[in-house]
């Protein structure tokens, strides 16, 4: 009976250590993902601004032409 309690305590102790290590790794992975998201947001903003500028360059001359009627 005593040896069974010892082995159960050992399994419980090792299991809690394993769970805490997994939780630390999971937190580290989440931090890395958050850091990567910031970089991808910047890339999306850069792509959006480039596209917006190209559209504006095409639309503005036509708009000025129609507004001021000087083509």
Swiss-Prot record:
Signal peptide: 1-22
Keyword annotations of the record: Amphibian defense peptide, Antibiotic, Antimicrobial, Cleavage on pair of basic residues, Cytolysis, Disulfide bond, Fungicide, Hemolysis, Secreted, Signal
Tissues in which the UniProt entry reports expression: Expressed by the skin glands.
GO biological process per UniProt: defense response to fungus; defense response to Gram-negative bacterium; defense response to Gram-positive bacterium; hemolysis in another organism
Coiled coil feature spans: none
Domain of life: Eukaryota
InterPro entries the UniProt entry points to: Antimicrobial_frog_1, Frog_antimicrobial_propeptide
Positions annotated as propeptide: 23-45
Pfam families: Antimicrobial_1, FSAP_sig_propep
Record-annotated disulphide pairs: 65-71
Subcellular localization: Secreted
Chief localisation class: secreted
A GO cellular component entry from the record: extracellular region
Protein role: Antimicrobial peptide. Active against a variety of Gram-negative and Gram-positive bacterial strains. Active against fungus C.glabrata 090902 and C.albicans ATCC 10231. Shows hemolytic activity against human erythrocytes.
Family as reported in the entry's similarity comment: Belongs to the frog skin active peptide (FSAP) family. Brevinin subfamily.
Protein name per its UniProtKB record: Brevinin-1SN2
């Amino acid at each position: 009976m005593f040896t069974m309690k010892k082995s159960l305590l050992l399994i419980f102790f090792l299991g809690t250590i394993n769970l805490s290590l997994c939780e630390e790794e999971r937190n580290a992975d989440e931090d890395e993902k958050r850091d990567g998201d910031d970089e991808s947001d910047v890339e999306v903003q850069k792509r959006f601004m480039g596209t917006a500028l190209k559209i504006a360059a095409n639309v503005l001359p036509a708009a000025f032409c129609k507004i001021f009627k000087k083509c």
